[in-house]
Regions:
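Accessory nucleic acid-recognition modules appended to NTPase machines
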Residues: 202-377
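N-terminal pre-Walker A segment at the start of P-loop NTPase domains
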Residues: 1-15
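Conserved lysine of the Walker
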Residues: 32
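Structural recognition of the conserved hydrophobic beta-strand(s) that form the central parallel beta-sheet
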Residues: 116-122, 143
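Interdomain motor-coupling "hinge/lid" segment immediately C-terminal to the ATP-binding subdomain
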Residues: 130-252
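Short glycine-rich substrate-engagement loop in P-loop NTPases that contacts/grips substrate
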Residues: 54-86
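Hydrophobic positions on the alpha1 helix immediately C-terminal to the Walker A/P-loop
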Residues: 35, 39
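Domain-level recognition of nuclease-like catalytic cores that cleave nucleotide substrates
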Residues: 169, 418-450
């Protein structure tokens, strides 16, 4: 069983006796059902699981379950005598978005207090935007993502002592010993190829076979494209599929942002003409959005009005599969003629999003672009990040100009690359790329008194 950080949260919630039902949201094939199933079977003597996607395609037993009694009746056809055990029973409603009326019903199931409930959803973000009667006070939504780099390290046998050492070195702005650096960088490059989809990671651990890993990734990539075709309106489906298919090629362009006129090859179109399509791709979890900001200040969410957008794949392994297929040299051997900038930016977007950051980039005609801006909670400022895949990692004219703007009040800046040495120069801290695992929102203290 792969270690997932969300496990601790799920266990804590189920044991807390909370009056809210937890829904784990995220893209398909990232391990939601598996982790809930494993936890549920460990914690509860009586475990009941129902998949609403399967039901919708089959008997449609829950299609008309609009009341608590109707739900119990439908559940009894699946659970049978297990419903007699009212105590120590967990009911897992998988793919709850298949029946949006069940989201409304959760409030009343919780109030009836017959069983403990947990749910998961794959296109839940989309459903929540279109369902008006969601009982927000009765549910907690927790987002889940593919394995991040630290989870990948743990899967590959990197122990807690090494993980603690990485965090300690990051905190003190020190370099890792060369031998450990080489090991971590090797695993990071393999992570670029494998990504964080559990099936791909398990295949890597079992066989190390890039061909079978790519087969898994290609199937999931195809599944995401099929999901895009589930949108109710046909004209929206085609545009959603087109935008999704454009993501890899957009990342190969210098600006990397979405070019609106390319979506339908029509002049005069604006970003606002495709709000529903972008919302679908982002809310479903299959793409990650990075919004443009031209005049940053803390908090960044107050400055995100600029109508420019970058989209990244939700898994870097899918991207390297599209770019390089089964050829691993492009990533593992630092081929000088191949620019891995979009690959490195994708893995950083994936990592930061999994850590809970909203993603922004700096775009200014005079100054240029800075890859990422995130909120620096510790200094109540903005933290710029530049991601470098090549050996010229100390060349970053846009970042230099950005730091010269005093009104931005930047307290620190990071450049992440393959280089081993950590150093600070002209207000910029140069870090090994694997230190991205340590860049997380500042955690609240256990007790903060006013």
């Amino acid at each position: 069983m792969l270690y997932r950080k969300i496990e601790k949260y799920i266990v804590s919630h189920l044991q807390s006796g909370s009056d809210k039902i937890l829904i784990v949201d995220g893209a398909r094939q990232i391990g939601k059902s598996y982790i809930i199933r494993e936890i549920g079977k460990k914690l509860f003597p009586n475990y009941i699981e129902v998949n609403m996607e399967t039901d919708k395609l089959g008997d449609r037993t829950f299609a008309d379950a609009k009341t608590v009694d109707d739900f119990y009746l439908a559940l009894s056809t699946v659970a049978g005598d297990r419903m007699k055990e009212k105590n120590n029973t967990l009911v897992f409603i998988d793919e709850i978005q298949a029946y949006d009326h069940l989201l409304t019903l959760l409030k009343f199931l919780r109030e009836d207090n017959k069983f403990t409930y947990i749910a998961s959803g794959s296109l839940l973000g989309v459903t929540l935007k279109t369902t008006s009667s969601i009982p927000l006070g009765s549910i907690i939504i927790r987002h889940m993502y593919p394995l991040d780099f630290e989870e990948f390290l743990i899967a590959n046998g990197i122990g807690q002592l090494v993980l603690d050492a990485i965090r300690k070195k990051f905190a003190s702005r020190e370099s890792m010993p060369e031998a450990i650096h080489n090991k971590l960088l090797d695993l990071f490059k393999k992570y670029l190829l494998v990504g964080g989809l559990p099936d791909a990671v398990n295949e890597f651990l079992a066989t190390k076979n890039i061909t079978t890993i790519r087969t898994i990734q290609n199937e999931i990539h195809h599944l995401y494209g099929v999901d895009a075709a589930r949108y109710e309106e046909m004209h929206n489906r085609l545009k959603i599929q087109r935008i999704y298919s454009m993501v890899p090629s957009n990342l190969e362009n210098k600006k990397k942002r979405v070019v609106v006129k390319d979506i339908e090859d029509k002049k005069g179109k604006r970003m606002s003409d495709y709000v529903e399509e972008f919302d679908y791709l982002i809310s479903s979890g299959i793409t990650l959005e990075v919004k443009a900001i031209s005049k940053p200040s803390f908090p960044l969410i107050e400055n995100s009005g600029k109508n420019l957008l970058k989209l990244y794949m939700n898994d870097v392994g899918i991207l390297t599969g599209i770019f390089f297929g089964t050829n691993i040299k492009a990533v593992m051997d630092d081929v000088a003629s191949i620019n891995l900038g979009s690959v490195y930016e994708t893995v950083v977007a994936q990592e930061l999003k999994a850590h809970g950051f909203n993603l922004y980039y700096y775009d200014n005609k005079k100054t240029g672009e800075v890859d990422y801006l995130i909120d620096d909670m510790e200094h109540l400022s903005v933290l710029p990040l530049e991601i470098k895949s090549g050996k010229d990692y100390q060349v970053h004219s846009a970042l230099d100009k950005f730091l010269q703007v005093k009104e931005y009040n930047i307290q620190q800046a990071f450049v992440l690359s393959n280089a081993q040495q950590v150093k600070v120069k002209d207000g910029i801290t140069y870090l090994p790329i694997y230190y991205i695992m340590c860049i997380e929102p500042k955690q609240a203290e256990d007790e903060v008194l006013l």
